[in-house]
Amino acid sequence: MRKSRSKTMSGMNRSDVPYEDAATDAGHPGDGHPLPGDPPYTRGIYPDMYKSKLWTMRQYAGFSSARETNERFRMLLEEGQTGLSVAFDLPTQLGLDSDHPNALGEVGKVGVAIDSIQDMRALFDSIDLGAVSSSMTINAPATTLLAMYVAIADEQGVSRSAIRGTVQNDILKEYIARGLYIYPPNHSMRLTTNLMEWCKDNAPKWNTISVSGYHMREAGCTAIEEVGLTLSNALQYTRTAIDSGLGIDDFAPRMSFFFSSHNDILEEVAKFRAARKLWYQLVKQEFGPEKKKSSQLRFHTQTAGVTLTAQQPLNNAVRVAYQALSAVLGGTQSLHTNSFDEALGLPTAESAKIALRTQQIIADETGIADSVDPLAGSYLVEEMTSRIISDSGSLIKEIDVRGGALECVKSGYQQKMIHESAWTNLQELETGDLSVIGAVSYTHLTLPTKA
């Protein structure tokens, strides 16, 4: 007899969901429930969602030299990718040149090395920056890398007002989950808001921050904690920007978010829907913006790298496919699908192509893109959405009581929370309560890698 899991990965009970009450509380499409494109944006930020325009297929890439990464970029664009996403190596993320002693052994290892504007020229050689949007996963030295990008756009004759893209620029999650920071928290926050102010006046189509739950989820937090911690960080950035003299409508329309898409399909869909509604409520209540876009949560999604296994790696292609499906069902604005071999090393050209094809198959063959918020009205999904809003909202209030996200970072509050959730997850793996096919269970099977 199959042993079913009674709880989601965040600990929500599945077996005692009050289906009828959930339907009554959540409402149904066409029954007075807000439509897609209408506040609070639970069902999506655009009325037609993917019926009129697909999400941006933005594969994360970067390795070795700028020249080699440029070749991968151009290959992906030729294969149908619709946006760029740059991975930088650790020395670049820490503001170190490749010949710095502390960079030894790390140059070009997990991303591309950018030491100078010459490297940036090579990175975007033969790529029209006026025709493609570029996301740069860079935080502590975000101002420097953006300055290089703008300089290359200037050389190409692309107006600064026309360049489109994103810098992650989310330093709080570096203190919480990654550790790639350079300056103390308060000074780092000042640099973050300085970039927002510059873009307001010079690059109005540039997303000045991508508030990231992804890295905290990879470090071990739950879906509920991912939403709560991410939106709490976003509130801190918003308050800091306003304290610096910016108005909410000066920068909030160009704030973006970045979430993980993990294994629990329905919980992940509910998570995305909940994050949109909760962010709308938080912004409207505290800041009262006039522009509609100031309270809309736009987000990028990446499939969960932490779920990939080195054992039986072809299984990862299946994991990535259904994680990508969750992101699309949840209304993501852009998506990166991991390559099946990433637990073993940098993706090959072939595995990167398969990852891109996964998105294209979902877009063109499944019919999912032809319906808006197709799981709306599901008793289970609506109940999960409501619970995540409630529990994540409680977490945000607790962080505010403790002085806000910045003060909690200094005390280690978020870090401790993530460590505890990661430990719980590890215990479930070790006891067999959580299955990982090919690594924890069914390990005796060997899948062929050649025909």
Task: List where the protein language model places each region.
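Catalytic alpha/beta active-site cores
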Residues: 1-262, 267, 286-289, 293-300, ...
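A glycine-rich phosphate-binding loop feature that marks nucleotide/adenosyl-phosphate handling sites
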Residues: 90, 167-172, 210-218, 252-262, ...
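Short glycine/threonine-rich loop-to-helix capping motif typified by GTGT followed
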Residues: 145, 220-228, 262-274, 303-317, ...
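Phosphate/diphosphate-binding loops
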Residues: 186-196, 313-316, 392-410
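Mobile "lid/hinge" segments at catalytic clefts and subdomain interfaces of large enzymes
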Residues: 195-196, 200-238, 318-392
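Glycine-rich anion/phosphate-binding loop at the beta-strand->alpha-helix junction
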Residues: 231-234, 267-355
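Conserved small/polar residues in nucleotide/adenosyl-binding loops
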Residues: 443-449
